[in-house]
């Protein structure tokens, strides 16, 4: 699954913001617009036993085309956000089944 950081028109969103993957399927977050974005999983909004810190990318992806890849193996719903733009609504969720 590929998730864009920033919409094609420059909006501060994850695109798609809600999606489903199979357990063990690789997710690629790709900076689409060249604004600094990061991917932080909410420690209170991941399946029990999952270390949110280990699957997050707190360092900024600054340039267009920069990517962060993560593979989630525990089934359930994971919520994530972009730290600098969470207030603007840059949040998302992935369901692993």
From Swiss-Prot:
Q: Which SUPFAM superfamilies match?
A: Cupredoxins
Query: S-adenosyl-L-methionine among the record's keywords?
Result: no
Keywords for this entry?
Answer: Chloroplast, Copper, Electron transport, Membrane, Metal-binding, Plastid, Thylakoid, Transport
The annotated topology with respect to the bilayer is: Peripheral membrane protein
Which GO cellular component term is one of those annotated? chloroplast thylakoid membrane
What is the designated name of this protein?
A: Plastocyanin A/B
Q: Which PROSITE patterns does the record associate with it?
A: COPPER_BLUE
Subcellular location(s) per record: Plastid, Chloroplast thylakoid membrane
Q: Which family does it belong to?
A: Belongs to the plastocyanin family.
Which superkingdom is the protein from? Eukaryota
What does the entry list as the binding residues for Cu cation? 37, 82, 85, 90
């Amino acid at each position: 699954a590929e998730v864009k950081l920033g919409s094609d028109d420059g909006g501060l969103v994850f695109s798609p913001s809600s999606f489903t993957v199979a357990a063990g399927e690789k997710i690629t977050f790709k900076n689409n617009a060249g604004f600094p974005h990061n991917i932080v999983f909410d420690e209170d909004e991941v399946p029990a036993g999952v270390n949110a810190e280990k699957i997050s990318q707190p360092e900024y992806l600054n340039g267009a085309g920069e990517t962060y890849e993560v593979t989630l193996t525990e089934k359930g719903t994971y919520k994530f956000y972009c730290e600098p733009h969470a207030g603007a609504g840059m949040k998302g969720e992935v369901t692993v089944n």
